[in-house]
Amino acid sequence: KRQVLVIGGGTGFYFYQRQQPRKAVENFLDSMKKMDFNTMESMIQSSDLTALDNADIRDAAYTDFFSEINKKMTYKITRNRFDIQNGTASVTAHITYIDGTNIYKATITEFLRQIVSNAYAGNQLTEEETQAKLASILNEQAKKVEKDVFSETDITYPVIKTDSGWKIVSLDDETVKIMSANFKSVEEEINNSLNNMDNEDSSGSSSNAPEASADDTLNLTT
């Protein structure tokens, strides 16, 4: 009888431990939906979320937009590969998230149109005013969307057991892409477009604002 209890206890311990990596990933993904950066940071072994800043996700100017986008994300854990001896696991999540490609393209086109209009009128905005205008247009374009467009992806998170519990090893690029609705940085694309306009002006070309059509592929990498 005692042997049965020992075996039963060992099995129970194993299944309990097996669920911990899964719960860690679920906690991380739930905090993504809520834009709870403190919890996200606590669930990352390196505690490094700087990639979110590179995508402007933690910029206060865009909080409303990204909060609205990320709360619509859903997920389902589809696989949990667990190694109790090494204290490691690989947890796969199937994630459905907002694809903001058309929102960004419409925002960039409208923003550049207004910038050119202000330039012709002799109005020069400060950096703060420019960012506020961009954030406002982004929110306006998001509200105009009649039906949300979703994308799906599978991410396998490497998870490791630490002294303070199970942690995801590091923040990956795909997760950042999800949180930013499929783009790395709208500000970077704006800067690239403005630089292109400056080059056109210096070469004597037309200074009309370029349009981002529905078929364009915007490259937001440096």
Residue positions per predicted region:
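Hydrophobic membrane-insertion alpha-helices, especially the h-region
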Residues: K1-G10
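Juxtamembrane cytosolic interface motif at the C-terminal end of transmembrane helices
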Residues: G10-Q17
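Short, aromatic-enriched amphipathic alpha-helices that serve as compact interaction elements
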Residues: Q17-D36, S193
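Solvent-exposed, acidic/flexible segments
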Residues: R18-P21, K33, A55-D59, D148-E152
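Extracellular, surface-exposed passenger/stalk and repeat segments of large secreted bacterial proteins
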Residues: S31, M35-S42, L171, V176-I178
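Short solvent-exposed beta->alpha transition segments
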Residues: E41-Q124, L138
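Short beta-strand edge/turn micro-motifs at domain boundaries
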Residues: E110-A132, K143-S203, T217
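Long, low-complexity, intrinsically disordered segments
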Residues: S207-T222
